[in-house]
C-alpha cells in the first residue's frame, strides 16, 4: 500500500521520451517506444509506502493560510491535507511546499531521533523518505498554485 500524490498541472507539459522503455518510478507501468516520441503530461505523480507514516507523525511542521500559521506534523500535510483545511481551503502546491520544507529541515536536524521509526519490515526508510520529500517539494515549487490530490 502506498500514498499516491498527484500535482495537476495548469497547462500540459511536453516531454520527449527517447526510444526504448519509459515507466513510472515504481515500475508498475512501462511502455516501449520504437522511436523518440513527444508526449503531453497533465500531472506529476509520486508514491511512497504507507510504512513511512509513523515517521511522518513524529516530524513537526507548520503551514500558513491567509497569513495564519497552523502547527501540524508531516503526516497530516502529506497523508490527510483535507482534514487540516489544506484540501478544503487551498490544497495547492504553495501551502504544501511550506509544510514539506519545514518538515525536511526538522528531519535533517533530527536524523538520529527519527531512525527509530524506520519500518521493521524494511519497506521504506529515512534514507528513502527524505529524497522523496525533496522531489515532492521541488515539484511543488516548480508548479506554483497547482492543485494536489492524494490517494491513500
Where are these regions (language model features)?
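Acidic (Asp/Glu-rich) sequence patches and key acidic residues
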Residues: 1-152
Amino acid at each position: 500500500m502506498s500514498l499516491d500524490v498527484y500535482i495537476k498541472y495548469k497547462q500540459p507539459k511536453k516531454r520527449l521520451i527517447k526510444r526504448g522503455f519509459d515507466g513510472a518510478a515504481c515500475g508498475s507501468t512501462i511502455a516501449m517506444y520504437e522511436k523518440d516520441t513527444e508526449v503531453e503530461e497533465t500531472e506529476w505523480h509520486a508514491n511512497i509506502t504507507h510504512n513511512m507514516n509513523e515517521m511522518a507523525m513524529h516530524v513537526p511542521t507548520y503551514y500558513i493560510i491567509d497569513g495564519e500559521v497552523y502547527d501540524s506534523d508531516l503526516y497530516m500535510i502529506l497523508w490527510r491535507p483535507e482534514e487540516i483545511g489544506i484540501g478544503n481551503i487551498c490544497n495547492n502546491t504553495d501551502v504544501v511546499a511550506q509544510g514539506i520544507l519545514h518538515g525536511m529541515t526538522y528531519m535533517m536536524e533530527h536524523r538520529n531521533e527519527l531512525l527509530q521509526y524506520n519500518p521493521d519490515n524494511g519497506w521504506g526508510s529515512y534514507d528513502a523518505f527524505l529524497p522523496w520529500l525533496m522531489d515532492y517539494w521541488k515539484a511543488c515549487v516548480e508548479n506554483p498554485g497547482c492543485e494536489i490530490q492524494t490517494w491513500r
